Amino acid sequence: MASIAHLIFSGLLAATVANSQQYEGSSRNEDAFNYVQPRNTTIFGQYGHSPAVLPSPNSTGLGEWHAAYAKAREFVSLLTLEEKADMVTGQPGPCVGNIVAIPRLGFNGLCLQDGPMAIRVADYASVFSAGVTAASTWDRDILYERAFAMGQEFRAKGAHIALSPVAGPLGRSAYGGRNWEGFAADPYLTGIAMELSVQGYHDAGVQATPKHFIGNEQETQRNPTFDPNGTVTDVLQEALSSNIDDRTMHELYLWPFANAAHAKAASFMCSYQRLNGSYACQNSKVLNGLLKEELGFQGYVMSDWGGTHSGVASIEAGLDMNMPGGLGPYGTIPEAGSFFGGNVTQAVKNGTVDEARVDDMIVRIMTPYYWLGQDQDFPSVDPSSADLNTFSPRSTWLREFNLTGERSRDVRGDHAKLIRRHGAEATILLKNENNALPLKSPKALAIFGNDAGEPTMGAVNKANFEFGTLAAGGGSGTGRFTYVVSSLEAIKSRAKRANTLVQYWLNNTEVATTDVTTLWVPTPPDACLVFLKTWAEEGEDREHLSVDYDGNNVVFSVARKCNNTIVITHSSGINELPFADHPNVTAILAAHYPGQESGNSIVDVLYGDVNPSGRLPYTIARNGSDYNAPPTTEIATTGKEDWQAWFDEKLEIDYRYFDAHNISVLYEFGFGLSYTTFNLSDINAEPLVKSISSVPEQLPIQPGGNPALWENVYNVSVVVTNSGDVKGKAVPQLYVTFPDNTPAGTPPKQLRGFDKVPLKPGESRAVSFQLMRRDLSYWDVVSQQWLIPEGEFVIRVGFSSRDLREMIRITPVTDST
């Protein structure tokens, strides 16, 4: 690879990334959280630590893809070698990623677009709830319909491929800058969300791209540091290496991606950082071994933008598509060449790369294209995308793109109603003393906080901004708003109908330093609503876990004088909440990033039109210092490969860690209140198969891996009752405790089931949880397979990870042979 690189880059001067969209964060503030890598840290270099798995497996059309696979093979047989190189190499163009057309074969190319909460490079498109918001619903129907609706908009804008959904980051660190793009700090909940999201996109006719595969758990040093005085490939320091052991990889980080593969995901996006030394996009153990062999993945692997660091080595390791195709930071210097492109042609001609491997790369790309019928009547790319795409503006295009069809087409349909409902269903009621909520015909309301009002920095959240509601985070995972309903706007609209007096103060500095009794007139309000926000973005990890803009002191200032202070947070995820125990803080709502209907969603909950049923997809600790697994934010050495993140906590992230060490928390994983109350009773468990062995039957691999792992082996049922006075939705959760003889490090309990159950007052309903073999298995590093341990399991069902009300014991393994 080194000699090829010298051929490519000899004589090239350093190039700037003009006009591209940058996502690397600025330097951290002095008071920011900081974790300096110890000097004695073991350093994993790029080679020799992650085992080689070669050659890259050929696709076979498994998983009902046989007809599409045959079409793809026929298509490849008609290509010239140069066209084959084009099919695996991105080009700058109207979309975030582009594969050029081949008109003589009737192939119109491929359009790849961000992202996980909206089609970002588009106008007149909806901005949906963020991943963490969707996960907070704990609602399978919502997880599916959110992806389906987004898929409809992607397709209508001419995008074949949605760069979504996100399972990496999983949420190892509370400070992760992109945690909000993903779902939950738990592999099971994230896995369900991934599977349903993939199905939703595909049912809308759009290819899903689970990302970022794998171990992408922090933003700091996710990419190499390039030499500003060198060529476009000269690196001063390599990207951080996520060093993960085999069992942790399988039981935590691979788990939700297995769900995505099981759902027949079209493509996977490999991540930026290194993994056990080797860059993720040229790590053959991960791409060939885990994904294509163990999980039977039949689609293609694309690089994250600029995540390709070699040509031949990456191709052999299992990378099928280089995005966006160029060199340098984020691959946005196409005029400097490409690791793929013409070098693929050259490598085939000189025998360095077998042409059959290139053929399989394209078969993998084209099979889902045919499977989803994208060769038939697919909408053209909206020409406005070319004007909005700052990643590859027209001045950088090297090829012609025939952009036809309606410009700035409105693809939103009636999705606003769906987004509003999703935001309300995701809202988590953390505290509700004295039945402060729902609001009861208030005569006067006081609104405080810089999150309440209209956004003040345009339609796209490119950076943090002081004034205006926060409905999305920043980076490639954000969306372009056509409108945002602010909380203040929605409250004023609702209050007008009831002749309620609404007064508001949106300057946090003023509120935090003022006696608020001097602000409101003529008498104290019935309730004081404080709106707070927390920004997070791609490219940098969070500097703290507190709310932004001195929000804590805003709450304390208001609560000193108002005995009915209600706090609402629009946040990327975990916040320290030092005001939670204040006696005058009567209610707290966590709304995360709800998308364009933000204000309407929260008003529906505040006034009781919707009974809150959101539940936490992570743990809120009492103190930020209680969290483990910090991101590496600084190193004390200068070696080129010194940036390391050792996942020494192994399986102990989030609630698993707090449970294992018996640490008190403020609000536990799965927690959330309602305007009603629920009870559980009559737990029962029955096997679904006659005999269960520890070792699974070795069946032919299908997408998702060994089909035996996906077999339902036990059914657990419980009765849920609404014991309150209003209708509501219960969220029963099932947790499994493994036998004592399971290998050391097994968490005390693990989520393995959940449901969302609407109930009228006094109504009861039986709920069933079906446990698959994989749900009762651990990864055995010796035999390299999933095993159900012999002995007694404890099954608990409750309403959070620490509110477990029903328990039953089972002994699944009845066949020890």
Swiss-Prot record:
The keyword rRNA processing does not apply. The active site is at 304. It is an enzyme of class 3 (hydrolase). One of its GO terms (molecular function) is beta-glucosidase activity. One of its GO terms (biological process) is cellulose catabolic process. Its EC number is 3.2.1.21. InterPro entries: Cellulose_deg_GH3 (IPR050288), Fn3-like (IPR026891), Glyco_hydro_3_C (IPR002772), Glyco_hydro_3_C_sf (IPR036881), Glyco_hydro_3_N (IPR001764), Glyco_hydro_3_N_sf (IPR036962), Glycoside_hydrolase_SF (IPR017853), Ig-like_fold (IPR013783). Glycans are attached at residues 40, 58, 229, 276, 343, 350, 402, 507, 563, 584, 623, 662, 679, 715. Pathway: Glycan metabolism; cellulose degradation. Residues 1-20 form the signal peptide. It catalyses: Hydrolysis of terminal, non-reducing beta-D-glucosyl residues with release of beta-D-glucose. GO terms for cellular component: extracellular region. Coiled coil: none annotated. It is found in: Secreted. Keywords: Carbohydrate metabolism, Cellulose degradation, Glycoprotein, Glycosidase, Hydrolase, Polysaccharide degradation, Secreted, Signal. Its main location: secreted. Belongs to the glycosyl hydrolase 3 family. Beta-glucosidases are one of a number of cellulolytic enzymes involved in the degradation of cellulosic biomass. Catalyzes the last step releasing glucose from the inhibitory cellobiose. This is Probable beta-glucosidase G. It comes from Neosartorya fischeri (strain ATCC 1020 / DSM 3700 / CBS 544.65 / FGSC A1164 / JCM 1740 / NRRL 181 / WB 181) (Aspergillus fischerianus).
